[in-house]
Amino acid sequence: ALSPAAILALEKEYANKKLAAYIFPGRNLSLTVDADPQAEISSKETLAENLTSLTLSNGARVILAKSAGEEQKLQITAVSNKGDLSFPAQQKSLIALANKAVSGSGVGELSSSSLKRWSAENSVTMSSKVSGMNTLLSVSARTNNPEPGFQLINQRITHSTINDNIWASLQNAQIQAL
Protein backbone atom coordinates (compact mmCIF):
# COMPACT_ATOMS: atom_id res chain seq x y z
CA ALA A 1 0.00 0.00 0.00
CA LEU A 2 1.17 3.53 -0.74
CA SER A 3 1.92 5.72 2.26
CA PRO A 4 0.25 9.15 2.55
CA ALA A 5 3.66 10.67 1.72
CA ALA A 6 3.93 8.56 -1.44
CA ILE A 7 0.43 9.60 -2.52
CA LEU A 8 1.36 13.24 -1.84
CA ALA A 9 4.48 12.79 -3.99
CA LEU A 10 2.33 11.35 -6.78
CA GLU A 11 -0.04 14.31 -6.54
CA LYS A 12 2.87 16.77 -6.75
CA GLU A 13 4.32 14.88 -9.72
CA TYR A 14 1.04 15.21 -11.63
CA ALA A 15 0.05 18.67 -10.36
CA ASN A 16 2.03 20.63 -12.97
CA LYS A 17 1.62 18.21 -15.88
CA LYS A 18 -0.68 19.14 -18.74
CA LEU A 19 -2.10 15.81 -19.83
CA ALA A 20 -4.62 14.95 -22.50
CA ALA A 21 -8.04 14.04 -21.12
CA TYR A 22 -8.15 10.39 -20.07
CA ILE A 23 -10.76 8.51 -22.06
CA PHE A 24 -12.43 5.71 -20.10
CA PRO A 25 -12.16 2.52 -22.21
CA GLY A 26 -14.97 2.45 -24.75
CA ARG A 27 -16.56 5.67 -23.54
CA ASN A 28 -15.77 9.37 -23.75
CA LEU A 29 -16.76 10.80 -20.37
CA SER A 30 -17.94 14.39 -20.56
CA LEU A 31 -19.04 15.27 -17.06
CA THR A 32 -22.00 17.65 -16.95
CA VAL A 33 -21.57 20.52 -14.48
CA ASP A 34 -23.44 23.84 -14.67
CA ALA A 35 -20.31 25.96 -14.26
CA ASP A 36 -18.05 23.66 -16.27
CA PRO A 37 -19.96 21.70 -18.92
CA GLN A 38 -16.77 20.22 -20.34
CA ALA A 39 -15.24 18.87 -17.13
CA GLU A 40 -13.14 15.87 -18.13
CA ILE A 41 -10.70 13.43 -16.57
CA SER A 42 -7.36 15.23 -16.80
CA SER A 43 -5.00 12.70 -15.23
CA LYS A 44 -4.97 9.06 -14.19
CA GLU A 45 -2.79 7.37 -11.57
CA THR A 46 -2.68 3.65 -10.85
CA LEU A 47 -2.51 3.21 -7.06
CA ALA A 48 -2.76 -0.59 -7.06
CA GLU A 49 -4.11 -3.37 -9.24
CA ASN A 50 -7.80 -2.58 -9.93
CA LEU A 51 -7.44 0.73 -8.05
CA THR A 52 -7.11 3.97 -10.03
CA SER A 53 -7.02 7.60 -8.96
CA LEU A 54 -8.44 10.19 -11.38
CA THR A 55 -8.15 13.97 -11.29
CA LEU A 56 -10.97 15.80 -13.06
CA SER A 57 -10.40 19.05 -14.93
CA ASN A 58 -12.67 20.82 -12.40
CA GLY A 59 -10.38 19.83 -9.52
CA ALA A 60 -12.30 16.85 -8.11
CA ARG A 61 -10.28 13.81 -7.07
CA VAL A 62 -11.89 10.41 -7.64
CA ILE A 63 -10.86 6.85 -6.79
CA LEU A 64 -12.13 4.05 -9.05
CA ALA A 65 -12.06 0.44 -7.85
CA LYS A 66 -13.30 -2.52 -9.86
CA SER A 67 -15.00 -5.11 -7.70
CA ALA A 68 -13.78 -8.69 -7.67
CA GLY A 69 -17.33 -10.06 -7.81
CA GLU A 70 -18.92 -11.98 -10.66
CA GLU A 71 -20.70 -8.90 -11.99
CA GLN A 72 -18.04 -6.23 -12.43
CA LYS A 73 -18.95 -3.07 -10.54
CA LEU A 74 -17.15 0.24 -10.50
CA GLN A 75 -16.78 1.94 -7.11
CA ILE A 76 -16.44 5.70 -7.56
CA THR A 77 -15.33 7.44 -4.39
CA ALA A 78 -14.70 11.17 -4.12
CA VAL A 79 -13.47 13.42 -1.34
CA SER A 80 -15.07 16.86 -1.28
CA ASN A 81 -14.74 19.90 0.97
CA LYS A 82 -18.18 21.17 -0.02
CA GLY A 83 -19.80 20.20 3.27
CA ASP A 84 -22.35 17.67 4.41
CA LEU A 85 -24.05 15.62 1.69
CA SER A 86 -26.32 13.81 4.15
CA PHE A 87 -29.68 12.65 2.84
CA PRO A 88 -32.81 12.51 5.05
CA ALA A 89 -34.92 9.34 5.07
CA GLN A 90 -37.23 10.71 2.39
CA GLN A 91 -34.13 11.35 0.22
CA LYS A 92 -35.28 14.81 -0.91
CA SER A 93 -31.67 16.01 -1.06
CA LEU A 94 -30.63 12.98 -3.11
CA ILE A 95 -33.53 13.54 -5.52
CA ALA A 96 -32.58 17.22 -5.87
CA LEU A 97 -28.94 16.22 -6.45
CA ALA A 98 -29.96 13.63 -9.05
CA ASN A 99 -32.21 16.15 -10.80
CA LYS A 100 -29.31 18.59 -11.06
CA ALA A 101 -26.80 15.92 -12.03
CA VAL A 102 -28.88 14.46 -14.85
CA SER A 103 -30.32 17.71 -16.21
CA GLY A 104 -29.42 17.87 -19.87
CA SER A 105 -28.80 14.12 -19.94
CA GLY A 106 -32.30 13.22 -21.13
CA VAL A 107 -33.49 12.01 -17.74
CA GLY A 108 -35.25 15.24 -16.76
CA GLU A 109 -36.94 15.96 -13.43
CA LEU A 110 -37.24 12.86 -11.28
CA SER A 111 -39.91 11.99 -8.73
CA SER A 112 -38.94 9.68 -5.87
CA SER A 113 -40.22 6.62 -7.76
CA SER A 114 -38.61 7.82 -11.00
CA LEU A 115 -35.28 8.27 -9.22
CA LYS A 116 -35.49 4.72 -7.86
CA ARG A 117 -36.30 3.43 -11.34
CA TRP A 118 -33.52 5.51 -12.95
CA SER A 119 -31.03 4.28 -10.32
CA ALA A 120 -32.14 0.68 -10.87
CA GLU A 121 -32.00 0.93 -14.66
CA ASN A 122 -28.52 2.42 -14.52
CA SER A 123 -27.32 0.22 -11.63
CA VAL A 124 -26.27 3.27 -9.62
CA THR A 125 -26.23 3.40 -5.83
CA MET A 126 -24.94 6.24 -3.68
CA SER A 127 -23.85 6.79 -0.08
CA SER A 128 -21.98 9.49 1.81
CA LYS A 129 -20.01 9.91 5.03
CA VAL A 130 -18.94 13.18 6.60
CA SER A 131 -15.57 13.54 8.32
CA GLY A 132 -14.77 17.03 9.55
CA MET A 133 -15.09 19.46 6.64
CA ASN A 134 -14.78 16.65 4.09
CA THR A 135 -17.49 14.50 2.59
CA LEU A 136 -16.69 11.02 1.33
CA LEU A 137 -19.16 10.28 -1.45
CA SER A 138 -19.35 6.72 -2.77
CA VAL A 139 -21.18 5.71 -5.93
CA SER A 140 -21.46 2.21 -7.32
CA ALA A 141 -21.97 1.88 -11.09
CA ARG A 142 -21.65 -0.67 -13.88
CA THR A 143 -18.11 -1.05 -15.21
CA ASN A 144 -19.37 -0.96 -18.80
CA ASN A 145 -21.60 2.07 -18.16
CA PRO A 146 -19.96 4.36 -15.58
CA GLU A 147 -21.40 7.64 -16.88
CA PRO A 148 -24.59 7.73 -14.73
CA GLY A 149 -22.36 7.33 -11.68
CA PHE A 150 -20.31 10.32 -12.73
CA GLN A 151 -23.48 12.30 -13.50
CA LEU A 152 -24.70 11.61 -9.98
CA ILE A 153 -21.42 12.32 -8.19
CA ASN A 154 -20.05 15.25 -10.15
CA GLN A 155 -22.65 17.98 -9.62
CA ARG A 156 -21.66 18.89 -6.06
CA ILE A 157 -17.92 18.39 -6.43
CA THR A 158 -16.38 21.25 -8.38
CA HIS A 159 -13.24 21.42 -6.27
CA SER A 160 -11.79 18.95 -3.78
CA THR A 161 -9.12 19.12 -1.14
CA ILE A 162 -7.56 15.90 0.02
CA ASN A 163 -7.23 15.29 3.73
CA ASP A 164 -4.13 13.05 3.86
CA ASN A 165 -5.46 10.86 6.67
CA ILE A 166 -8.88 10.38 5.07
CA TRP A 167 -7.26 9.68 1.69
CA ALA A 168 -4.85 7.14 3.22
CA SER A 169 -7.50 5.30 5.23
CA LEU A 170 -9.89 5.36 2.26
CA GLN A 171 -7.23 3.94 -0.04
CA ASN A 172 -6.28 1.23 2.47
CA ALA A 173 -9.94 0.30 2.94
CA GLN A 174 -10.36 0.00 -0.84
CA ILE A 175 -7.25 -2.20 -1.10
CA GLN A 176 -8.49 -4.40 1.78
CA ALA A 177 -11.85 -4.69 0.00
CA LEU A 178 -10.09 -5.92 -3.13
Regions inferred by a protein language model and the residue ranges of each:
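M16 family metallopeptidases and their MPP-like homologs
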Residues: 1, 70-103, 107-159, 170-178
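Proteolytic maturation boundary segments
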Residues: 1-89
